[in-house]
Amino acid sequence: MAFDKNTYLYEGKRMFRQNTSHLQSSLFGIASQLPKAKLEKLQKSKEYDFYQLVFCKINEKDFSVLYSDHCSRPNAPVNSLVASIILMYRNNWTTEALFDRIDFDLLTRTALGLDTLEETPFCPATFFNFQNRLLCHFSQTGHNLIERVFDGLTEQQLKILKIKTDIQRSDSFMAMSNIRSYSRTQLLIEMLIRLHRILSDEDQKRFNDILSPYIKQSSGQYLYTLQRQQIPQEQEKLGRLYRTLYEALKERYKDFEVFSVFERVYTEHFTIIDEKITVKTGQELNGSTLQSPDDIDATYRKKRDRHYRGQSVNVTETAHPDNELNLITDVAVCSNNTDDSKILNERVGPIKEKTPDLNELHTDGAYGSEDNDKKMEELEITHVQTAVRGRQAEVSMEIEEVSDGQYKVKCPHQCVSSEKARKRYKACFDVEICKQCPLSSHCPAKQQRDKRTYYFDRSDYLLGKRNRNIKSLPPERRKLRPNIEATVKEFTKPFNHKGKLRVRGLFKTMVYAHAMAISINFGRVWRYMAENPDFFALSNFLCGILPCLFARNSRNELRKIIIRDKNRCWFEPRLYFKQAA
């Protein structure tokens, strides 16, 4: 059997079908049935531009790795699946609401490139299986394909709109998982109930006597019957029960996911001392302990007297004052007990790769660290902080680099050149002047026989430089960071009244974050298009001609277009950019 090479992608024996059917509209499609006024309204809608600016730009080839190496049933259209995920999170729809929109909403169908009312691009099972494939691929390779879509779209948008990326800003927010908040004792009981469900009938009968008090009711109901003073004894009892079950079941159930979670809870909350099971104290537990059996990735953090269970999302966007609009350039998701400075240390490299001209990054005080100072110096990025973490020094020592290995150190009353010590640098101050200084008792310089000596290394120089960076900027560039709070608000808008996502787990949070980033960037571009239609004449022409280039790669597709209308292949781009403008 012969296959069209444009439609089917080969990687070894892998067969993958790209969705190009949307490039050729149906003769009896939606456009032919709508009155002229309604058709014009449809073509001016945000969903129509979503189709052009997002749907048509999704690189389906990136997803070919998700499918079989052998000839099999053709895959569902990937661009429709990815675009549906973006629309679902953008509009805060449930999955059921998404399919209702696909079936009955003309605007949603337009956004997905559906030209007729009869077709449905995929069923719910296919939609869920696609997300499972994404998760499996991420688990095996560490690559999030939705992030790749975001990076590809953003790269095109930055280039076409000529957005300056040399100045950017970054901030993070808490994304709480859609899980129940368990107390320690309730979590221990809940895991016993979950473990009992996977036991064989034989094992359920075997352990019925010791498990029956817990499985007859929910964990919350059991906990409700306990008095506060009974909690320590109950935890000790649970520890003995956990040890008995673990020793008896570990060989038979070691491959079960629920048992793996049970084992994790057992090792996190209990320890064996002198052959006796002991309950760990609260101080021995940390934010990385299991928060819920429904989300094994969630971590705990207390911030500003509020308790968070879930993940943390870090967002970076352009911030040059000359830009008429700014776009998100990077999104990172990690455990919420990860310090912002560590997140920045891991992400500044990829951000620099995506936007090589980056030379100034604005953050709040939580992002500063010694490792980051070294990384920023290596990448030639000026780190501007709007605040400084920790207490302010009573006597400041300003260190200025004169040349390689040569520094000038300035205190409130003296300025001296540095000398090289054995491992560090030192600055020697005149002791007579120091005696007259009212700040002498708080000075970090050490008193010696005939001088006062201040010891420092390069990290101290970089720290002082970072703290002073904001003072070296013109006034209009000192307050660039706060605007990213509005971007954070766009991400958190779909959260429920408790500040929780609809989803659970690290990967689903990553999909949410990158889908929302695509949506937010699209919204900004769309609003900018509405305000500057003339600017998009050339860029939309280039966007419009891409479908024709797609078709020209396949003689069969080109022939289909020419048969229907000899001029359609060449006139369609003009209509394309005209409608988008």
Model regions and ranges:
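Basic, short loop/linker segments at the boundary and entry of helix-turn-helix/winged-helix-like folds
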Residues: 41-83, 456
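N-terminal intrinsically disordered, low-complexity, charged/polar
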Residues: 2-44
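Anion-binding and metal-coordination hotspots
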Residues: 97, 102, 116, 128-581
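General structural concept
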Residues: 80, 106-113
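Short amphipathic helix-turn modules centered on a small-residue break
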Residues: 62-68, 110-117
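N-terminal core-binding DNA-recognition domain of tyrosine recombinases/integrases
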Residues: 69, 92-94, 136-137
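Alpha-helical support elements that line or immediately flank enzyme active sites
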Residues: 82-92
